[in-house]
Amino acid sequence: MTELYAKSDLEKIKETLPGWQLDSFNYLNEKIGDKENKFPCIPGRQAFLSDQLRIAFVGDPRNPETAKELAPLLTRYGTISRETGKYASLTVIFHTPEELLTDYKIEDYESLFWQLLNSLSMEDPADWPDDIPENPDNFQWEYCFNGEPYFVLCATPAHSKRKSRSFPYFMLTFQPRWVFEDLNDTTAFGRNMSKQIRKRLEAYDEVPIHPHLGWYGKKDNLEWKQYFLRDDENQVSQCPFMKMKNLFKKKRSD
């Protein structure tokens, strides 16, 4: 069974990890823990350094079985996330074979990301929450699993300029929506945090801050547009989650 690890857990057992898992954990440690070139996401960095972040390793993201491997893990995480701290997050690192590193471009990883989210939804043990719209083009939409809303972000080996979304392995981070209850534009704390994060992003990335980064719940903001950011500002015109979900529904009814 796939484990949920804290940073301190992995420090104790890292010499027993398979090579790719050890390598990816070391990269994560270097990237998030860097004291000079600080990672822009302040809550994410704090979660990692204070052992609130949970980390898991799963298989090749192209393999249909990987979504089935991830589903019980995310279900389990949803039951314990509030116990881990106010900056709770789950980072999932995928086995990323050499052919992915050499053959996949950012657009390929983008398609893979949405395919994986859709496949994961097919394994969801719960119905979609009544208080979250099912249409991603609704400003109150968020990805949900087992009744829990999550902000999801993807990092890939193909990213080179948007360093905040670059990682040597295909990686997803699930941030529970409740984490942002105090991190919004209605609180001075939230507004100040946003300013600090944007300031760090400007210094960290080699491209301007993406125009779609915004506040959840604002009518001019769509969450799905922030999940996968390319190195440039280009983006698909229609949310692939809804498109694929409708396709799956059609196949089921045929």
From Swiss-Prot:
The lineage of its organism: Bacteria, Bacillati, Bacillota, Bacilli, Bacillales. This is Uncharacterized protein YqcI. Pfam families: YqcI_YcgG. It comes from the Bacteria. Belongs to the DcsA family.
